[in-house]
Amino acid sequence: MPNFSGNWKIIRSENFEDLLKVLGVNVMLRKIAVAAASKPAVEIKQEGDTFYIKTSTTVRTTEINFKIGEEFEEQTVDGRPCKSLVKWESENKMVCEQRLLKGEGPKTSWTRELTNDGELILTMTADDIVCTRVYVRE
């Protein structure tokens, strides 16, 4: 079983602003979010299939607790409440499908994958826009 536990720092990000744009975040808030999210602190604690993930930026801190295969509530990257379900796609990759609790919006999901060279790859998808963020352990 992969070990996602640790404190992670970002080394690369692609399409984050495009993702926020397709989610309907206005230009001013996008600029603030992109600047704040350029150096997030990510802490992951894992016990088997149970996860705690805390992501801290200068603007916002989010915390989620979940178990693989059990639905839970969280927020989409733009802050809308949703139900999420995480499953293992492969030995080192988890996939989360999100369903908005109310209203309409783009179909959103995320994945987290550990690579053989120790990187954590987070992908966030809204409709056909994919944002990729790559982290290494601190």
Swiss-Prot record:
MF terms in GO: fatty acid binding; retinal binding; retinoic acid binding; retinol binding
Annotated GO CC locations: cytoplasm; cytosol; endoplasmic reticulum; nucleus
Subcellular localization(s) per the UniProt record: Cytoplasm; Endoplasmic reticulum; Nucleus
Gene for this chain: CRABP2
Main location, first listed in the record: cytoplasm
Species this protein is from: Bos taurus (Bovine)
Task of the protein: Transports retinoic acid to the nucleus. Regulates the access of retinoic acid to the nuclear retinoic acid receptors.
Family assignment from sequence similarity: Belongs to the calycin superfamily. Fatty-acid binding protein (FABP) family.
Motif, Nuclear localization signal: chain positions: 21-31
Pfam families: Lipocalin (PF00061)
Binding residue positions for all-trans-retinoate: 133-135
Quaternary state and interactors: Interacts with importin alpha, RXR and RARA.
Entry PTM: Sumoylated in response to retinoic acid binding, sumoylation is critical for dissociation from ER and subsequent nuclear translocation.
Entry annotated with the keyword Ion transport: no
Domain comment in the entry: Forms a beta-barrel structure that accommodates hydrophobic ligands in its interior.
Protein name from the UniProt record: Cellular retinoic acid-binding protein 2
GO biological process: fatty acid transport
InterPro entries per UniProt: Calycin, Fatty_acid-bd, ILBP, Lipocln_cytosolic_FA-bd_dom
Keywords (A to Z) from UniProt: Cytoplasm, Endoplasmic reticulum, Isopeptide bond, Nucleus, Retinol-binding, Transport, Ubl conjugation, Vitamin A
